[in-house]
Each structure stands twice: as structure tokens, then as C-alpha cells.
Design a protein with these regions (language model features):
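Long C-terminal interaction/binding lobes of large macromolecular proteins
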Residues: 1-252
Length: 252
């Protein structure tokens, strides 16, 4: 028995709708609330593996990072409310749902089923601090307003950077990556009676603003970003091992 093209397309549409009926409850730490999410599909898992392969073989430092972020934003019901610092805990919950509760790292089997819930109480205050809005004023009269960005800002900036620099080798892009990273955190730059909102700027304009900032601004932002990295490190630390956040998280 064969299925003609029209029937197949109809059946495929029904299959996709059937998949979308099965929601997954994802805990979003910055919201301290549950967000309904679509489950990861085989196609999306393949995209994760392909993204990691592209990152490795073509030295494209953005590829895998972009794919996992894209999946989170597409699958979660409230993408505009998800913060960058939510990315790792959301990814861990997707991994538990798709592959299972355990992952083997350096021949050690880790149970990650409750990792997010176990870690959160220890870092709750740190999370609140990094998602709050802060200001820093330099001795030259420039004030930067900054915070950990929404995930969609991280995605947009990384996507633009990938288009611009995907062919550059890793060692040639380090200085540019530094500006890309700090630009995500800056909301506004103020001086005299003027203000520049980075949230409204295109990629190239963001980079130009970062180039014009005094060194004291960048050092202050780096110290703040290190606090975000510390939170991320605690999410992936378990029993003396580091839970991988590359494609191996979803590969086995």
C-alpha cells in the first residue's frame, strides 16, 4: 500500500500537531516559575549534533551555541522572558526529557535529574543580582547601564557575529568576541544629556559603541560577566565532574 503525496503531507501535518500536544514543564530559574515547552524533536537533536560538528570542523565558534539557543526560544512558550542565565538549566531539563536522567562523564555516571532544583537554592541570590539592572559611572562622565541580557538578545548578537565572522579562525577572533560578549550586557550608555540605547542598535553600531568606551567600563563589565559564569559553572558541576554543554549532552 502506498501513500500519495497529498495524503502524506496531510499525515505529516497531523504528526507534527500530535507532537505539539505533548508539552514539557520547564522550570525557569529567573522567573521561579514553570514554563510550558514543546519537546525536542529528532530534527532538532540532529541540528544540535550538526551544529557541534560545524563548530569543530570549521572552527565556527558560534554554531552549536546558536542552535541550542534557537531551540530554546522556539520551543518555550514565553521566549521573551527567558534570560541568558536560564540557558544552561533549560538545556539540562531538555536533556533529561530526551535522553534520560543519567550522563557518563570521564567514566563516572551522573544523575542529573534534579541538578537544577538542587543547585538553585545555593545561587538564588546570585541570580537575582545578575538579572537586576546596575549602573557604573566612569571618571570621564560616562555611565553604562547593564544587566544580564534576555536570551533573545544573546541569540541575535551571536547570529549577527556568526554571519560576519564565521570564516575567521578562533585565534583571529578573540578580540572581536570580547566586544561581542560585553555588548550583550550593556543596555544604555549615557553622557552629558545624551543617551545611546544599545537595545535598539544593529550589530555594527553595537561594536562601535564598545570601541568608544573607556577601559574602566570594560573591566567593570568583565567582573560582572564573571559572576554570570560562576552561576553557569555551578549548574554544570556535579560530584567533582563537569556536565558537558556541547553536543555530547544530547548525543548519548
Amino acid at each position: 500500500m502506498t501513500t500519495d503525496t497529498k495524503d502524506f503531507d496531510q499525515l505529516l501535518g497531523k504528526l507534527q500537531k500530535q507532537h505539539e500536544k505533548a508539552n514539557l514543564d520547564i522550570y525557569i530559574p529567573t522567573l521561579q516559575d514553570i514554563s510550558p515547552s514543546k519537546k525536542i524533536t529528532v530534527e532538532q537533536q540532529t541540528q544540535l549534533l550538526t551544529g557541534a560538528l560545524t563548530q569543530e570542523t570549521r572552527k565556527n565558534v558560534f554554531s552549536y551555541n546558536r542552535v541550542i539557543t534557537e531551540i530554546i526560544l522556539k520551543n518555550c512558550s514565553n521566549p521573551e522572558e527567558i534570560n541568558l542565565v536560564d540557558k544552561i538549566p533549560v538545556a539540562l531539563q531538555y536533556r533529561v526529557d530526551t535522553i534520560g536522567d543519567t550522563i557518563t562523564v570521564n567514566d563516572v555516571t551522573l544523575d542529573i535529574s534534579n541538578q537544577v532544583n538542587n543547585v538553585f537554592p545555593n545561587i538564588e541570590q546570585k541570580i537575582q543580582h545578575v538579572i537586576d539592572t546596575h549602573q557604573f559611572e566612569t571618571d570621564t562622565g560616562i555611565t553604562i547601564t547593564y544587566s544580564t541580557p534576555p536570551l533573545y538578545i544573546d541569540y541575535a548578537v551571536n547570529s549577527d557575529a556568526e554571519k560576519k565572522w564565521s570564516d575567521m579562525q578562533g585565534e583571529d577572533i578573540i578580540s572581536e568576541l570580547f566586544k561581542v560578549e560585553i555588548s550583550k550586557y550593556i543596555q544604555q550608555v549615557s553622557f552629558d544629556s545624551d543617551a545611546i540605547s544599545l537595545m535598539e542598535l544593529d550589530f555594527n553600531s553595537r561594536m562601535k559603541v564598545c570601541d568608544a568606551l573607556p577601559m574602566s567600563c570594560t573591566k567593570h563589565l568583565v567582573d560582572f560577566i564573571e559572576q554570570v559564569k560562576d552561576i553557569e559553572n555551578q549548574y554544570v558541576s556535579l560530584s567533582g565532574q563537569v556536565i558537558p554543554m556541547d553536543a555530547t549532552l544530547f548525543g548519548a
